[in-house]
Amino acid sequence: MNIHQDVVDEQLRMGRVRRVADVTVYWLGQGSFTHEEALSIIEHARGEILTLCPGKEEVFELVIRPRFLRILTERALIEWGATDSVN
């Protein structure tokens, strides 16, 4: 492959990673799931993302998983009515 094709392939992979992350964010924020089901969705997204980007487990754990977990935390606070006491 030439450098141009490598760049195009990388851009396509990153676009797919973004879509997986965006869909996961949407599901976690809007779907009706138990906590265990939500964690399963996160693990599924992790598998998809690491298939696209092998060897990037640390990046997932440091950047992407916290984003997903933050959504679950915010949603739980809203559902429990705890946001009034936090804000």
Q: Model features per residue range: what roles?
A:
Residues 2-35:
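N-terminal acidic leader/helix
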Residues 6-12, 39, 60, 68:
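Helix-centric, low-specificity signal for extended rod-like, repetitive segments
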Residues 7, 35-50:
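Short linear, low-complexity motifs centered on an aromatic residue
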